[in-house]
Curated annotation (Swiss-Prot):
Stored Pfam families: 3HCDH (PF00725), 3HCDH_N (PF02737)
Functional description taken from the UniProt entry: Catalyzes the NAD(+)-dependent oxidation of L-carnitine to 3-dehydrocarnitine.
Pathway: Amine and polyamine metabolism; carnitine metabolism
Quaternary structure, from the entry: Homodimer.
Lineage: Bacteria, Pseudomonadati, Pseudomonadota, Gammaproteobacteria, Pseudomonadales
Name of the protein this chain belongs to: L-carnitine dehydrogenase
NCBIfam families: PRK07066.1 (NF005471)
Keyword Transferase: no
Family: Belongs to the 3-hydroxyacyl-CoA dehydrogenase family. L-carnitine dehydrogenase subfamily.
Amino acid sequence: MSFITEIKTFAALGSGVIGSGWVSRALAHGLDVVAWDPAPGAEAALRNRVAKCWGALEQQGLVPGASQNRLRFVATVEECVRDADFIQESAPERLELKLDLHSRISAAARSNVLIGSSTSGLLPSDVYESSAHPERCVVGHPFNPVYLLPLVEVVGGKNTAPAAIQAAIKVYESLGMRPLHVRKEVPGFIADRLLEALWREALHLVNDGVATTGEIDDAIRFGAGLRWSFMGTFLTYTLAGGEAGMRHFMTQFGPALQLPWTYLPAPELTDKLIDDVVDGTTDQLGKHSISGLERYRDDCLLAVLEAVKTTKARHGMA
């Protein structure tokens, strides 16, 4: 079966932080968007979120014809997906809810329309267990803010057709994203597994009084974080090996992996640890509001993305 990859109408189910990010990205790429969310006040909240991020999208560059007015909010799942060319679900992370929702989505959608789920913690074989035509169903796990960050992890389940994965990658690329095909179904996929390891270590360091939350964030943003925006861990360590590269690095520093530097198991989330983390991040926020911090983040990301894009082009890097 061939799947639709030329998208004119994008269906978004769930309009929270992630869902609204998908809506904003699709609108910015000149698509008609049909959205559904059963929560009271969801439409007003969605339109407000889209309006808040539109300035950043304008700065990044809108596709001709892009408009917030191309968003339509509907009352039922069936109306949302019936005429859609691509469907993205971003409902809460509860398996029972997603099973019921995808049963309804797949029954109402055309059989050659791809269905993506934004889930970060559930496996596609489980999410799509009750779906009709599960061969067209994938996980498309994005990163916040979805309307700016390009990474989307694409994961197939036991019934997903290889052609559906390639078709989904093509669709996500058309939305200006950088799809990463996760080859096996594993909990947390790729990026969140890496982030979870860092998060656990950070909590241990706070819990043991080694560092404050601000000091840990400084260790990241003034060190590895600057490199991570343009060069990942493996290339960074390749450079650390000098002219001999990664093999020399592994030979020289490989034994250090046996040193007990890291805790790995998650710390117990005691009231004290939670309080320490909350107090620390409150101090970091200072006088700034969450919305103000979001605007700061967006401006930084736009600047970093543009700088990396320009520098990559100059050096012929992918």
